[in-house]
Design a protein with these regions (language model features):
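N-terminal presequence-like segments and adjacent domain-start helices
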Residues: 1-21
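Conserved alpha/beta core segments of nucleic-acid transaction machinery
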Residues: 108-113
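Amphipathic alpha-helical interaction surfaces in cytosolic regulatory modules
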Residues: 12, 19-48, 53-104
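Short, cationic-aromatic polyanion-contact patches
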Residues: 140-148
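A short, conserved structural fragment
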Residues: 130-140
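Short glycine/proline-centered loop/turn elements that form peptide/ligand docking sites
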Residues: 102-103, 121-125, 145-146
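Short amphipathic alpha-helical interaction segments
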Residues: 117-132
Length: 148
């Protein structure tokens, strides 16, 4: 099962209906805890948690660490997949993950997947997706989800 999490909506529900930026560690902690609650409340086992960042203005390093890195450490068997990622989001998330030796999946606009973070962790993540039959390698060498 793929669980969809609207990060912008979680941010608005957690803090303020007009807040669009993920900045400061306390903000990140509140948002992460809310996301963890949503994931824990799922009725069926979650294979992939798609976190949609559409509508999120910016994310700083502390929020990238507090949300993405900590969720990766505590996600269990669920694979985190980030969508709606801007170049600015990527610039904050990538060095945080690389520093922790972690990787996360990014879903590009064309539906293809790429791993972001530490190179070894990124390669292992893509291999795990294929091994678990959650994704398949395409003839062009990219990876695409097989789950709907």
């Amino acid at each position: 099962m793929i669980q969809h999490i609207d990060v912008h909506q979680v941010l608005q529900e957690s803090l303020s209906s007009v807040y669009a930026d993920l900045v400061t560690r306390p903000t990140g902690r509140v948002v992460r805890e809310r996301i963890e609650s949503v994931m824990a409340a799922a009725r069926h086992p979650v294979a992939v948690a798609r976190m949609d960042f559409t509508g999120v203005g910016c994310i700083d390093y502390s929020c990238a660490d507090e949300i993405v890195a900590k969720l990766l450490r505590g996600a269990g068997r669920a694979i985190l997949l980030l969508s709606g990622i801007s170049d600015g989001h990527r610039e904050a998330i990538e060095p945080v993950l690389a520093g922790h030796g972690l990787a996360v999946l990014i879903e590009r606009r064309d539906g293809k997947l790429e791993a972001l973070g530490a190179p070894e962790a990124a390669a292992a993540l893509l291999d795990e997706l294929v091994a678990r039959r959650l994704a398949a390698r395409t003839p062009g060498g990219t990876v695409a989800l097989t789950l709907a």
